[in-house]
Each structure stands twice: as structure tokens, then as C-alpha cells.
């Protein structure tokens, strides 16, 4: 489960760290778009 948690850390990080959330959101947006 450590791998799953590590993969979901960025997702949870969005709510904890706005700065990290912006970077993750940008990557997700580029990936989907």
C-alpha cells in the first residue's frame, strides 16, 4: 500500500500545499489536454 499512498500523495498535497497543487494541476492539465 506504500506505493499506492506514494502515488496519491500529490493529490492529497493539493489540499495541503497550494504551491504543490498548482504544479500538479498544471501537469494533470497538460496530460489530459
From Swiss-Prot:
<dbReference type="GO" id="GO:0090729">
    <property type="term" value="F:toxin activity"/>
</dbReference>
<comment type="similarity">
    <text>Belongs to the MSDIN fungal toxin family.</text>
</comment>
<keyword id="KW-0883">Thioether bond</keyword>
<feature type="propeptide">
    <location>
        <begin position="19"/>
        <end position="33"/>
    </location>
</feature>
<feature type="propeptide">
    <location>
        <begin position="1"/>
        <end position="10"/>
    </location>
</feature>
<feature type="modified residue" description="(3R,4S)-4-hydroxyisoleucine; in form gamma-amanitin">
    <location>
        <position position="11"/>
    </location>
</feature>
<dbReference type="InterPro" id="IPR027582">
    <property type="entry name" value="Amanitin/phalloidin"/>
</dbReference>
<feature type="modified residue" description="4-hydroxyproline">
    <location>
        <position position="18"/>
    </location>
</feature>
<feature type="cross-link" description="2'-cysteinyl-6'-hydroxytryptophan sulfoxide (Trp-Cys)">
    <location>
        <begin position="12"/>
        <end position="16"/>
    </location>
</feature>
<comment type="function">
    <text>Major toxin belonging to the bicyclic octapeptides amatoxins that acts by binding non-competitively to RNA polymerase II and greatly slowing the elongation of transcripts from target promoters.</text>
</comment>
<keyword id="KW-0379">Hydroxylation</keyword>
<feature type="cross-link" description="Cyclopeptide (Ile-Pro)">
    <location>
        <begin position="11"/>
        <end position="18"/>
    </location>
</feature>
<protein>
    <recommendedName>
        <fullName>Alpha-amanitin proprotein</fullName>
    </recommendedName>
</protein>
<dbReference type="Pfam" id="PF24112">
    <property type="entry name" value="Amanitin"/>
</dbReference>
<feature type="modified residue" description="(3R,4R)-4,5-dihydroxyisoleucine; in form alpha-amanitin">
    <location>
        <position position="11"/>
    </location>
</feature>
<keyword id="KW-0800">Toxin</keyword>
Amino acid at each position: 500500500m506504500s506505493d499506492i499512498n506514494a502515488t496519491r500523495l500529490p493529490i492529497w498535497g493539493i489540499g495541503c500545499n497550494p504551491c504543490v497543487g498548482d504544479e500538479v494541476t498544471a501537469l494533470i492539465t497538460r496530460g489530459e489536454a
